[in-house]
Amino acid sequence: MPTFSHLHVHTQYSLLDGAASVEKLYDKDIENNMPALAITDHGNMFGAFEFVSQAWKKTKIVGKDAFGNDILEPIVKPVVGCEFYVVEDMHIKTFTKEVKDKRYHQVLLAKNKKGYEN
């Protein structure tokens, strides 16, 4: 079976769009043997800390360090993201046939800490 991961998921922090809790989503991905999960809530990252914290509560041993200590990583890799709103002109509030609604959604995912900082 091919490897699959959900990379565009809304949680309870996407009002009117998502209902699943971060913990339940993460547990379901473990149950389904998915290697990663990205949460991409609408216009906010309120669940990011909870999401990464949840991931580090459920880890696996991937090796030993030079001192013989276990090296741990999350069972399912947490990918932090957000579905941002993109507009050409944020001051336009009404639209007509001539002035079309040019609002878009753009999903951005952070590959690592540097990506998150950007």
Predicted regions and their residues:
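Phosphodiester-processing cores and adjacent nucleic acid-binding clamps
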Residues: 1-118
